[in-house]
């Protein structure tokens, strides 16, 4: 990439009004090369095919609670569990967070580190780091003001131990924000049943050679998430359900229905929810 192009990318990344605009700069290509570029293309394949206005809006709103918490507390210690290629971690660092992203996929951590190197070369996201690690690898004394998980919790096992570990990593008054698929949604459950059979826990050998339990799309409800973390000392502050239709342009015309209030009667229609809890 030429110097003028890099300068333009730096301005657009730093000046992005939301995370969707931030990701769009990366989707245009040219900032990564080699294995990192290939991993990025595969990881964001659906967004590269279609990143429409509706999809962009929901992608931007998905991180709204975590984003607001970081902006309200510059320098907040942030942990992203299951960071993937690091888009949310990098964005939260741009908002003023001191961010650590962890993942158990070596290729994704390498891709996130490559993106971080680009950001830091452009003068951004200095307070950010990515580690190949599980939450169980984090020291007992580690404390975070915000823990963020996006479509990760349903993979983490053993579930009860995960909940206790996550709660222990939260500083007093720290927040937990989890974005998850809604187990009440019948269409989602049918799709998952066809794709993976019954929800189950399997043993996987990680990229580091260690065996660990893995939840095969063990999605849960917001009510169950609230109960699990309440038992571990994390009190629910809010739950927000959103989005009814998949990420395909054909559904854009129905977006008006997705703004309907999330009353109990229509909760099964929503695909996702965000849970926000605070450690007392």
Q: Model-derived features: where do they sit?
A:
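A C-terminal cap/extension of S-adenosyl-L-methionine-dependent methyltransferases
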Residues: 138-140, 193-195, 223-230, 236-280
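A short glycine-rich, Lys/Arg-flanked "PGG" loop and its adjoining helix->strand segment in the class I
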Residues: 160-175
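Acceptor-substrate binding/catalytic loop of class I
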Residues: 208-223
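A short acidic, Gly/Pro-enriched loop at the edge of an enzyme's catalytic core
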Residues: 136-147
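Conserved class I S-adenosyl-L-methionine
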Residues: 2-73, 75-84, 177-202
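Class I SAM-dependent methyltransferase SAM/SAH-binding core
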Residues: 87, 91-136
């Amino acid at each position: 990439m030429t110097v003028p192009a890099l300068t333009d990318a730096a301005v657009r990344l730093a000046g992005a009004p939301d995370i969707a605009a931030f990701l769009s700069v990366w989707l245009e290509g040219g900032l990564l090369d080699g294995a990192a570029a290939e991993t990025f293309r595969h990881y964001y394949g659906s967004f590269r095919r279609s990143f429409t206005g509706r999809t962009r809006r929901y992608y931007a709103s998905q991180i709204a609670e975590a984003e607001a918490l970081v902006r309200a507390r510059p320098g907040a210690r942030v942990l992203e569990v299951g960071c993937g290629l690091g888009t949310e971690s990098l964005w939260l660092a741009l908002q003023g967070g001191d961010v650590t992203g962890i993942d158990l996929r070596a290729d994704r951590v390498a891709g996130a580190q490559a993106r971080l190197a680009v950001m830091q070369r452009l003068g951004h996201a200095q307070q950010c780091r990515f580690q190949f690690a599980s939450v169980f690898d984090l020291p007992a004394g580690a404390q975070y003001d915000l823990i963020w998980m996006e479509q990760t919790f349903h993979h983490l096992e053993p579930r009860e131990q995960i909940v206790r570990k996550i709660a222990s990593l939260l500083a007093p008054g720290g927040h937990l924000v989890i974005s998850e698929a809604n187990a009440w949604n019948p269409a989602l459950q049918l799709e998952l049943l066809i794709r993976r059979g019954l929800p189950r826990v399997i043993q996987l050998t990680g990229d580091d050679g260690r065996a660990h339990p893995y939840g095969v799309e063990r999605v849960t409800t917001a009510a169950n998430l609230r109960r699990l973390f309440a038992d571990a000392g994390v009190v629910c502050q809010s739950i927000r359900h959103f989005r009814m239709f998949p990420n395909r342009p054909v559904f854009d015309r129905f977006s008006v229905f997705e703004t309907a209030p999330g009353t109990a009667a229509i909760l099964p229609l929503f695909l996702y929810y965000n849970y926000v809890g605070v450690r007392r």
